Amino acid sequence: MALRWGIVSVGLISSDFTAVLQTLPRSEHQVVAVAARDLSRAKEFAQKHDIPKAYGSYEELAKDPNVEVAYVGTQHPQHKAAVMLCLAAGKAVLCEKPMGVNAAEVREMVTEARSRGLFLMEAIWTRFFPASEALRSVLAQGTLGDLRVARAEFGKNLTHVPRAVDWAQAGGALLDLGIYCVQFISMVFGGQKPEKISVMGRRHETGVDDTVTVLLQYPGEVHGSFTCSITAQLSNTASVSGTKGMAQLLNPCWCPTELVVKGEHKEFLLPPVPKNCNFDNGAGMSYEAKHVRECLRKGLKESPVIPLVESELLADILEEVRRAIGVTFPQDKH
C-alpha cells in the first residue's frame, strides 16, 4: 500500500524531496498534497510536481484525512510549529534537520509525538546512504579494532545565501552544517552522551556562528572532533580510527557515495537523479523516504537508525556549543 505524503512548505529542499518521491514506485509512495503559507505558491508547486491538492495554510494540510505522513521542509525556526500542528492532527512526521533551533524545541516535539503515539523522525538523510550503512557494518564487525577517535569537517562559503547568515532565522554553521558532523561522531560512538565538550569559534558579523571547532570527550577515553564553517572551504570528509585501521567517508561526507576502509576504496552509486535537483546527491533522499515507509508499515513510532533520544542529544550538544561561543537566537529561552 502506498504511503501518502503531504509536503509542508515549498522551498528548495521540499522540491527535491518531492521530486525524489516521484521517482519511487507509485505503489509505495504518493504525494497527495502540498501546503504553503501562500496559496499561489502552493498551486505553482503542485502544478510543477503534479500534486492533486494545494493548500494555502499548513493547518489545511494537517487536517486532510488523505495525508498519512507530513514532510516538514520549512526553515529551522518554523519546524516546531509545523511539526506540532501535524502531530495534533494525528499525522506521522518526517522533519528536516535540525529538528529544532534548540533542545527545548526538540523535547517539546518528542514529548508530543510520544504522548500521541505518533511516528516522528529527524531527516538526517546521511545515515541512510549505502556508504553510511556500510560504515556501520564495518564498525559492528570490529574491523577497525578498538576505536580511538572520530573526525569530521564540513565547511563552504555560504555568505551569499541570505538564510545562512540570518540571525533571526537561526543561521550559522552549527545548525546547517555542524549537525552533519555531530551526527557522524554520535553514530560512530553509538549515541553516547559526551562527558566533556570543548569549543573554539568565531562569530560572523551578523551574530551567527561563523567557524567552529569542537572536541567531544566520550566514555572510555575516546574522542571526536569536528570543524564547521560558513566562510571557509573545508575537506568535507569524515573519518573514524581504531587500533587496526581507519575508515573514511569522502567528500561530500553529508551525502556520501565513497567509503575507504583500511585503504580499500568502495563506491556506492546513487539512484537516477530527478531533473533539476537543487542539492548535491539529492537522489539520496530516497533512502530516508523508504526507511520512513518501512517504519510506518511495521508500526514503529520512531526510527531505530536515528531514534528520538539521539535527536535530543544532538540538539543538546549543538546548543551547548553555541552557548560556549556566545551565540543565542531569538528562539532560545533565557
From Swiss-Prot:
EC numbers for this chain: 1.3.1.20, 1.1.1.179
Lineage: Eukaryota, Metazoa, Chordata, Craniata, Vertebrata
Variant or mutagenesis effect after changing R148A: No effect on activity. Reduced activity and exhibits significant temperature sensitivity
Assembly notes: Homodimer.
Tissue and organ expression note: Kidney.
Site (May play an important role in coenzyme binding): Y71, H79, K97
Species of the source: Macaca fascicularis
Keyword NADP tagged: yes
Pfam family, one: GFO_IDH_MocA
Protein name per its UniProtKB record: Trans-1,2-dihydrobenzene-1,2-diol dehydrogenase
Biological process annotations from GO: D-xylose catabolic process
Residues annotated as site: May play an important role for the adaptation of the alcohol substrate into the binding site: D176
Molecular function GO terms recorded: D-xylose 1-dehydrogenase (NADP+) activity; nucleotide binding; trans-1,2-dihydrobenzene-1,2-diol dehydrogenase activity
Keywords tagged on the record: NADP, Oxidoreductase
Phenotype for R202A: No effect on activity. Reduced activity and exhibits significant temperature sensitivity
Keyword NADP tagged: yes
Site (May play an important role in catalytic activity): Y180
Record's catalysed reaction(s): (1R,2R)-1,2-dihydrobenzene-1,2-diol + NADP(+) = catechol + NADPH + H(+); D-xylose + NADP(+) = D-xylono-1,5-lactone + NADPH + H(+)
Family the UniProt entry places it in: Belongs to the Gfo/Idh/MocA family.
PANTHER family per the UniProt record, alphabetical: OXIDOREDUCTASES, TRANS-1,2-DIHYDROBENZENE-1,2-DIOL DEHYDROGENASE
InterPro entries the record matches: Gfo/Idh/MocA-like_OxRdtase_N, Gfo/Idh/MocA_domain, GFO_IDH_MocA-like_dom, NAD(P)-bd_dom_sf
